[in-house]
UniProtKB/Swiss-Prot annotation:
GO terms for biological process: translation. Residues 1-49 form a transit peptide. The keyword GTP-binding does not apply. GO terms for molecular function: mRNA binding; rRNA binding; structural constituent of ribosome. One of the primary rRNA binding proteins, it binds directly near the 3'-end of the 23S rRNA, where it nucleates assembly of the 50S subunit. The lineage of its organism: Eukaryota, Viridiplantae, Streptophyta, Embryophyta, Tracheophyta. This is Large ribosomal subunit protein uL3c. Part of the 50S ribosomal subunit. PROSITE patterns: RIBOSOMAL_L3. It is found in: Plastid, Chloroplast. It comes from Arabidopsis thaliana.
Length: 271
C-alpha cells in the first residue's frame, strides 16, 4: 500500500474536525524534522510526530577559540561562550492554549526603542526586561517554569555533559565549486583551458536538463547548522563563560543555542 505523506502546521491540525474522529488519532513522537509529519501505517491510521528538545537550553554568544590544558597536560581546543543579560522565560506555551508545550526564552538586553511595539508589549506582559532574541524550546514537560524566571547555565549543565550547539555559519558569499564543494581543479598547463571550471553538469538530449541538487557554484555559508554531542570542558562562574570542546558555528559575537545532547536510549526512546 502506498504511503501518503504531507507536511502541515499544527494549528491547522487542531482546527480539523477529523481529529476527533475514530479514523484520525494523533500520536506525538519525537522526530528529526521540526515540522509536523502525518503518515499512515498499518496499525494506526495517522501518526503525528514533532521535534522536541531533550531538555531546556540557553542562548549564548561566541567569544572565540583557545587551547585548554587539562591536568595531565593534554591540550584541548575549546570555544569560549559568554552570556549576556537574559536567558529569561518570557512565555509558557501549553497544549491547551497553543497546541504544543514549549518554553519561550529571551536573550540579550536592549533598549526599548530597539524593539517594535508588539515585541515590547509581549515582554511587558511577562514582566521581563526588553530583549533582542526570543526562541522556543519544545519540551515534553513544562512544569516548574514560570514567566520572568531566569535560567542559569551552571544550574542546567555541568562539566562533562554533552550538548548540541546550533548557530549560523560564517557567510562566504558566492563561491565556486572548488571552495564550495571541494572539487579537484584541472591542469594549469599543457594546453588546458579549464582550470577551475566544473566540467560536465549533465547529459545531452536525455534528460536534456540539469538535475535538481547538482553541486554548482553558489552562495556559501550563512546557513543554520547544529553540531551535536560536544563536551563541556570548563564552566567558569566568575567570568560567566563556558568552554566547549571543538569549533562552534559562526564568528565571534554569533548567537548560539545550547541544548542537552540527544542520545538514543538515554533521553530519546529507541525505535
Amino acid at each position: 500500500m502506498a504511503i501518503a505523506m504531507a507536511v502541515v502546521s499544527f494549528p491547522s491540525l487542531l482546527n480539523k474536525t477529523t481529529l476527533s474522529s475514530s479514523l484520525f488519532t494523533p500520536t506525538f513522537l519525537p522526530a528529526k524534522s521540526s515540522s509536523l509529519l502525518i503518515k499512515s501505517s498499518p496499525k494506526t491510521r495517522f501518526v503525528v510526530s514533532s521535534s522536541m528538545e531533550a531538555g531546556i537550553g540557553v542562548m549564548g554568544s561566541k567569544l572565540g577559540m583557545m587551547s585548554f590544558f587539562e591536568e595531565d597536560g593534554t591540550v584541548v581546543p575549546v570555544t569560549v561562550v559568554g552570556f549576556r543579560e537574559g536567558n529569561i522565560v518570557t512565555q509558557i506555551k501549553t497544549l491547551a492554549t497553543d497546541g504544543y508545550d514549549a518554553v519561550q526564552i529571551g536573550y540579550r538586553r536592549v533598549r526599548d526603542k530597539k524593539l517594535t511595539k508588539p515585541e515590547t508589549g509581549h515582554l511587558q506582559k511577562a514582566g521581563t526586561i526588553p530583549m533582542r532574541h526570543l526562541q522556543e524550546f519544545r519540551l515534553t514537560n513544562i512544569e516548574g517554569f514560570e514567566p520572568n524566571q531566569k535560567l542559569v547555565f551552571d544550574e542546567i549543565f555541568k562539566e562533562g555533559d554533552l550538548v548540541d550547539v546550533a548557530g549560523t555559519t560564517i557567510g562566504k558569499g558566492f563561491q565556486g565549486g572548488i571552495k564550495r564543494h571541494h572539487f579537484k581543479r584541472g591542469q594549469m598547463t599543457h594546453g588546458s583551458k579549464s582550470h577551475r571550471a566544473l566540467g560536465s553538469i549533465g547529459a545531452g538530449t536525455t534528460p536534456g536538463r540539469v538535475y535538481k541538487g547538482k553541486k554548482m557554484p553558489g552562495r556559501m555559508g550563512g546557513t543554520r547548522t547544529k553540531i551535536r554531542k560536544l563536551k563541556i570542558v570548563k564552566v567558569d562562574k566568575e567570568l560567566n563563560v563556558v568552554m566547549i570542546k571543538g569549533a562552534l558555528p559562526g564568528k565571534p559575537g554569533n548567537l548560539l543555542r545550547i541544548t542537552p545532547a540527544k542520545i538514543v536510549g538515554v533521553n530519546i526512546p529507541k525505535n
